[in-house]
Design a protein with these regions (language model features):
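Catalytic alpha/large subunits of respiratory electron-transfer oxidoreductases
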Residues: 1-212
Length: 212
C-alpha cells in the first residue's frame, strides 16, 4: 500500500546483474500492476534494444569460434570478459592463423591482432571498405564480429551498434547457414532480462533517467 501511494510514475525498478529470470518477471508484473513504466535491466547503460533477440545474443555460439575465418572485436577484451571464449579464439588463431582485428582499447589478448583504432570512424572505415581489413572480411566465408560492453556502454554506443550492424550487412556476416554477429555480455542476467523485456515501457525512464 505504501508503494502504491507514491503513484506508478514516481517509482522505478532495476534488475541486478545476477538476478534470475523468475524474479525479474515477478518484479516486472508487480511494476505493471502499479502502473510503473520505469524499469531497466541494463545497469551499465548498454545501448541494447529488447525488440530483436538476434541483436543482443551471441548468435554463433562458442563453437562458432572454431568455424570463423576472420574476426573483428569491437570494444571487448575477451581475455578478461570470457576466458573460455578467448581460449577458443587463440586456438583458431594458433592452428589456422585466424586474421583478427580490434577496435577499442588495445590489450594483451594472447594472440596477434591488428588494432584499427578506438572510435566510430574506425568502424565506419570498415563499413565503407576504406580499410584493408575490410577486404579480409569480404573475402571470408564465415566472417565474425564480437561487440562488447566497452563499446555499448559509451555515450555513442547506439551509433556504434548501428555501425556494427552495417559492417555485418556489408560483409555478409549473416547468411542462411551462418550468423557471425555476436554481442558479448558481462552480466549473467542481461540476456534473460532482455528476453522478458525488462526495459522501460512506453513513456518510461531508463537507467540514466532513473539515476538523475
Amino acid at each position: 500500500k505504501k508503494i502504491k501511494s507514491f503513484g506508478g510514475k514516481s517509482i522505478a525498478a532495476l534488475a541486478g546483474d545476477l538476478a534470475c529470470i523468475e524474479s525479474m518477471f515477478a518484479l516486472k508484473e508487480l511494476m505493471r500492476s502499479l502502473g510503473c513504466p520505469n524499469l531497466d535491466c541494463r545497469q551499465d547503460g548498454a545501448k541494447l534494444s529488447a525488440k530483436n533477440r538476434a541483436g543482443y545474443i551471441f548468435n554463433s555460439g562458442i563453437a562458432g569460434i572454431d568455424e570463423t575465418d576472420s574476426l573483428l572485436l569491437i570494444g571487448t577484451n575477451p581475455r578478461v570478459e570470457a576466458s573460455v571464449l578467448n581460449a577458443r579464439i587463440r586456438r583458431n588463431w594458433f592452428s589456422r592463423r585466424l586474421p583478427i582485428a580490434l577496435i577499442g582499447e588495445p590489450a594483451d589478448l594472447t594472440y596477434d591482432y591488428e588494432h584499427l583504432g578506438n572510435n566510430l570512424d574506425s568502424l565506419r572505415a570498415l563499413s565503407e571498405g576504406r580499410h584493408p581489413f575490410a577486404e579480409v572480411l569480404s573475402a571470408s566465408e564465415k566472417p565474425m564480429l564480437i561487440i562488447g560492453m566497452g563499446a555499448l556502454t559509451r555515450a555513442d554506443g547506439e551509433a556504434i551498434l548501428a555501425m556494427a550492424k552495417q559492417v555485418s550487412d556489408v560483409h555478409d556476416m549473416v547468411i542462411d547457414d551462418w550468423n557471425g554477429f555476436n554481442v558479448l555480455h558481462t552480466a549473467a542476467a542481461r540476456v534473460g532480462g532482455l528476453d522478458i523485456e525488462f526495459v522501460p515501457a512506453k513513456g518510461g525512464s531508463d537507467i540514466n533517467d532513473i539515476q538523475t
